[in-house]
Amino acid sequence: MAESNFVDYVKIYCRSGKGGRGSTHMRREKYTPNGGPDGGDGGRGGHVILRGNRNYWTLLHLRYDRHAMAGHGESGSKNRSFGKDGADKIIEVPCGTVVYNAETGEYVCDVTEHGQEVILLKGGRGGLGNWHFKTATRQAPRFAQPGEPMQEMTVILELKLLADVGLVGFPNAGKSTLLSAISAAKPKIADYPFTTLEPNLGIVSYRDGQSFVMADIPGIIEGASEGKGLGLRFLRHIERNSLLLFMIPADSDDIRKDYEVLLNELKTFNPEMLDKQRVLAITKSDMLDQELMDEIEPTLPEGIPHVFISSVSGLGISVLKDILWTELNKESNKIEAIVHRPKDVSRLQQELKDMGEDEELDYEYEDDGDEDDLDYEYEEEDWEDK
């Protein structure tokens, strides 16, 4: 089976650059016998920076580039010349990427907008040259600061797609059929469970050139929170949605029970998802006449808008779009910033294994003869912001 191009979970090793050494150069010129210190400052080490890029919608490009390392700052030189700063390492990521510490599971940052930049690891500051340490009683200091050391961290990048409406339902509930019917998206559709193996996004056109984004994820089954089926690992992609559209087919034995099962799986995954506005669509309703619809209506869950639809015949599609648009534009349904919970450390290694990301990514450092940098006592007042 070919490997999917949709990658929403990768582990990478990141390392910033260390600061360059300050110079200990003493000015020596023919007619300046007591020139004194003129050693320049070392350059700043490169930062590791995450940048949101709307042209990416998957983390596939990072699966084969697991080491992100910035450049080291260069040493200062004579005439108080600054060392060159190390090159920053820019990591382009899709909007909606969340970063966790791969060792502790702690939430680190979130990139949600195109062009947004987040400094993941700061480069070390360059060491001060010896001219900074000249005093009335110390005219010729023959020492300078080493640069600050680099920082390193192995991180998990987890993509959570950005959409307005998320489709929730069992396999074969008609989610992909609806998405293909009301948008230009072309998800795989077939009459067997788990046809959808990865999330799909579609832009739904509304009136007067307005539109909203809909996300379809693999179907959920009862027990998904215990590892059954495919859907649970993809639920992160509807965490950011303003509205959840529950889809249950008209031939269900008990629509209310199926709705409660789906609701419980969401609650198990993230209780905050129950705070989102919900709409219920009874799919495949072209098999029903008005009398059957009237019989089913009293048995439906209370307190949420509902509509009978058929993606094949077009029944109720316009009404559904009206309901979704109205709900999306209610002030009470405006999505708030997500509070990202840290990962459970006790389950983190198993999660990495399940996602195929349990490979060790440690990097072997090059020996550049700066061992004494590690022993230097860095004090904040010694540094100048550069």
Swiss-Prot record:
Disulphide bonds in the chain: none
Domain (Obg) ranges: 4-162
Binding-site positions, GTP: 169-176, 194-198, 216-219, 283-286, 310-312
Co-factor requirement: Mg(2+)
Matches recorded under InterPro entries: G_OBG, GTP-bd, GTP-bd_Obg/CgtA, GTP1-OBG_CS, GTP1_OBG_dom, GTP1_OBG_dom_sf, OBG_GTPase, P-loop_NTPase
Keyword vocabulary terms for this entry: Cytoplasm, GTP-binding, Hydrolase, Magnesium, Metal-binding, Nucleotide-binding
Biased amino acid composition, Acidic residues: 356-386
Pfam families: GTP1_OBG (PF01018), MMR_HSR1 (PF01926)
Gene Ontology cellular-component terms listed: cytoplasm
Residues covered by the OBG-type G domain: 163-329
PROSITE patterns: G_OBG, GTP1_OBG, OBG
Enzyme class label: hydrolase
Subcellular location: Cytoplasm
GO BP: any one term: ribosome biogenesis
The enzyme's E.C. designation: 3.6.5.-
UniProt-annotated stretches for the region Disordered: 18-45, 351-386
Alphabetical list of CDD domains matching this protein: Obg (cd01898)
SUPFAM superfamilies found in the cross-reference section: Obg GTP-binding protein N-terminal domain, P-loop containing nucleoside triphosphate hydrolases
Main subcellular localisation: cytoplasm
Compositional bias ranges of the Gly residues kind: 36-45
Gene Ontology MF terms in the entry: GTP binding; GTPase activity; magnesium ion binding
Primary role: An essential GTPase which binds GTP, GDP and possibly (p)ppGpp with moderate affinity, with high nucleotide exchange rates and a fairly low GTP hydrolysis rate. Plays a role in control of the cell cycle, stress response, ribosome biogenesis and in those bacteria that undergo differentiation, in morphogenesis control.
PANTHER family: DEVELOPMENTALLY REGULATED GTP-BINDING PROTEIN-RELATED, MITOCHONDRIAL RIBOSOME-ASSOCIATED GTPASE 2
Subunit and partners: Monomer.
Family recorded in the similarity comment: Belongs to the TRAFAC class OBG-HflX-like GTPase superfamily. OBG GTPase family.
Protein name: GTPase Obg
Organism: Bacteroides fragilis (strain YCH46)
Gene this chain is encoded by: obg
